Every structure is written in structure tokens, then in C-alpha cells.
Amino acid sequence: MAHLVWMLGENGEEKSFENPNELLPLSRLEEIGVLYWHLDPKKSESEEELTKIRRERGYSYFDLTEICPDKLENYEEKLKSFYCEHIHADEEIRYCLEGSGYFDVRDKDDKWIRIWIKEGDMIILPAGIYHRFIVDSNNYIKLMRLFIGEPVWTAYNRPQEDHPVRQEYVKNVKGDTGFALAAH
């Protein structure tokens, strides 16, 4: 299982920065409530594992999306929207079936952590975490998006410190309660 997670520079604007100075352990993601799995979309065992994850976490709906100039209408406009720092009121669950891209998430000190997801990587971003997304230099990613119930994809652009979901997230990440984590 290969994962690539690293800190971005002070300004956090390295849209295509692919050469990290120092890789971070997955435990840095767990500290902020981000879950990670690696499944091989070409193996049946991974389908069984995905079914188990969906059942245990209540993900009853999924769809597929391809982010590339030929497949996504208003591609440049959508990329700008994805890259604008935001939160969601629900978890954001993404399973990479093909291609690759970056999810940037804020750590406890409000610094950017970059997660380079590639084929087989599945991540869950907790509700209320500031994040953004951008494709890498391959300019293509095919994702399975999973949801609890009917899909809701409302982005709340930063600042959202008064949003109840953001307040709950901050309480969990900085407080004593922490997150209930179950990934591998």
C-alpha cells in the first residue's frame, strides 16, 4: 500500500506540487478525523471490502464522476470551485477508481496537509473539515462518490466558524472526545 501525504508550504498554493520534502504517516490524518483505505478496484476481494465498509458506515448511495476536460462540463470553472477552501455538513467519501488527484485538508494548526490519492485509495473527510481538491498533472481522475441516503453536496466556503458542523468538528479534533476511527 503506497500512500503519499505531506505538508504544503506556508502559502499552501502549490497546486501541482508533486515532490514532497517529507512524507507524513497516516496517523497525522487520523488525528484530524480523515480515514484512509487502499482497495484494488481490479480485485474481487476489494469489492467485498468496499461492501463491508458501505454496510458498516451506512453508505446506501453512490455515483461515479470523471474529472477531466473531455468529461466534465465547465471543467475550468468546476476546478476553481473544487479548489476553493470549503466544508460540508456531511462526510465526503471518495474512492479513486482511475487516475489521481490531491485532497488538501487543514490540520489542527490550520496548516495544509496534501493527500495524493491514486487508483485504489479511498478517503473519508469528516463533516466540518476545511478542504479542497485539484487534479494532478495527469489531469484525470475517476471517483466513486458515496453518500448516506440521498446525495447532498453543498459546499460552504470559508469562513464557516459559526456553522454547527464546523463547531462540532473543532470540538472533536481539539477536544478530549476525539474521533472514532476505523480504517486501515
Swiss-Prot record:
Pathway: Amino-acid biosynthesis; L-methionine biosynthesis via salvage pathway; L-methionine from S-methyl-5-thio-alpha-D-ribose 1-phosphate: step 5/6. Gene3D superfamilies: Jelly Rolls (2.60.120.10). Keywords: Amino-acid biosynthesis, Cytoplasm, Dioxygenase, Iron, Metal-binding, Methionine biosynthesis, Nickel, Nucleus, Oxidoreductase. The keyword ATP-binding does not apply. InterPro entries: ARD, ARD_euk, RmlC-like_jellyroll, RmlC_Cupin_sf. It holds the Pfam family ARD. Ni(2+) binds at H86, H88, E92, H131. GO terms for cellular component: cytoplasm; nucleus. One of its GO terms (molecular function) is nickel cation binding. Binds either 1 Fe or Ni cation per monomer. Iron-binding promotes an acireductone dioxygenase reaction producing 2-keto-4-methylthiobutyrate, while nickel-binding promotes an acireductone dioxygenase reaction producing 3-(methylsulfanyl)propanoate. Fe(2+) binds at H86, H88, E92, H131. GO terms for biological process: L-methionine salvage from methylthioadenosine; methionine metabolic process. Its EC number is 1.13.11.54, 1.13.11.53. The keyword NADP does not apply. Disulfide bonds: none annotated. It is found in: Cytoplasm; Nucleus. SUPFAM superfamilies: RmlC-like cupins (SSF51182). Transmembrane segments: none annotated. It is an enzyme of class 1 (oxidoreductase). It catalyses: 1,2-dihydroxy-5-(methylsulfanyl)pent-1-en-3-one + O2 = 4-methylsulfanyl-2-oxobutanoate + formate + 2 H(+); 1,2-dihydroxy-5-(methylsulfanyl)pent-1-en-3-one + O2 = 3-(methylsulfanyl)propanoate + CO + formate + 2 H(+). Its cofactor is Fe(2+); Ni(2+). Catalyzes 2 different reactions between oxygen and the acireductone 1,2-dihydroxy-3-keto-5-methylthiopentene (DHK-MTPene) depending upon the metal bound in the active site. Fe-containing acireductone dioxygenase (Fe-ARD) produces formate and 2-keto-4-methylthiobutyrate (KMTB), the alpha-ketoacid precursor of methionine in the methionine recycle pathway. Ni-containing acireductone dioxygenase (Ni-ARD) produces methylthiopropionate, carbon monoxide and formate, and does not lie on the methionine recycle pathway. Belongs to the acireductone dioxygenase (ARD) family. This is Acireductone dioxygenase 4. The gene is ARD4.
